Amino acid sequence: QRQMCIRDRGGTILGTSRQPFKLMRVPDKDGIDKVEAMKHTYHKLHLDCLVILGGNGTHKTANLLREEGLNVVTLPKTIDNDLWGTDMTFGFQSAVDIATDTIDRIHTTATSHSRVFIIEVMGHKVGHVTLHAGIAGGADIILLPEIPYDIKAIKNVIDKRTQAGKRFTILAVAEGAISKEDAKLKKKEYKEKLANRKYPSIAYELAEQIEKETDKEVRITVPGHTQRGGTPCAYDRVFATRVGAKAAELILNEEYGYMVAMRNGETVKVPLEEVAGKLKYVDPNCGLIKEARTIGISFGDEV
């Protein structure tokens, strides 16, 4: 009965917190070791198992607790779809639907004005949401963290569309999109550059560059945390139900230390130590990228 009440709710039912993994073993201001505190609570409550839902950071912590002797089973929950070992994560498709709807709505107004429109989509390190929403929404240019862009290539696409009589150009841009010049910087140098950047995000930096290169007006839309909220789509409800049922099966069989994954349409168990700390990036040479290029979508990398 409880499950029926929450199947159409997004977010976290029990609540959550953000704790950087690198600080898990660092005592807080009260001198409390967070890992030891979790172990103490686990045993105090006489728990059989911890079922942990989350993304990359969550799985690193879950694996740490496994190494500390706790019984753990995890579920892949993140809009980024960046967890290694699973084809899909729940939350991803709902976020793609929201981002796609945003691009669709921009198309409606874009047809009336000779402008460039930038939709900034969530994704700091990986571009799965941007890639799928960009294709589904009919973006002309898609910029991903995995494929550094060249502003000249973007200019060329806009110019060619203008010459062909197109009145607008739409860019789907991951918030972690990076230029070819910045991609050459060392990690520390790039972080310092971001810290000193005058723009609130990549979309605003791109907008200024595009206006300078093309003399086009640029408008920016940032759907932001709307991509993380609202009612989960039907796909995610079914997906979450399936991996949840598989997790219950593992617990009943006392099989601990696994993430429940989806591979080739089937729920499977993947050892946590194989998942923790690994990101699933967009492969620049994957079929989806190649197919997108075939239908004329630019990734801002070809001048």
Residue spans for each PLM region:
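Short beta-strand elements at the ligand-binding edges of bilobed clamshell
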Residues: 85-96, 231-237
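Accessory alpha-helical/coil subdomains and C-terminal extensions
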Residues: 41, 49-54, 62-64, 92-111, ...
